[in-house]
Amino acid sequence: MIQVISSWEIGWNYPRMESDMWEMVLREFNVDCQCMMPKSGIKAHENQTFLMEYNDVAEAIDAARAAGRSIVFVDESGAEELEAFTHPADAAYVFGRTSQNLMQLYMDANQGDVSLKVLTPNNTGLPFGHQIAAIVLYDRFKKAS
């Protein structure tokens, strides 16, 4: 199972609009579950059949761990580079908000969790989560082919 966990870019966009940007990428790469926070109430929309909302990222990560998924933090400060990464079969990829360093979550990470980075020419951390998710999911697809 493939799961993606991230936060709404509150103040930049509306969750309803942002969910469409995420959904297009995630469905194309057969992601099973999209987990977003904080709760916005858009789950009731008929096209959001695989969207789950949580109060915060820790709650979503705890649920993924309880389901037996490997936690993969994707961040510009990640320890492992995407090129050398072997994707777990059951994975929950955690993306922060734009320019949000996930280092605090790494500090709370369980042994076995991975911190992954996608190198870009400027490595500023500015691409949106759904943009980096497309790169990570494409890498997963190509390595599985």
Give the label of every model feature segment:
Residues 1-145:
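Post-transcriptional modification and biogenesis factors for structured RNAs
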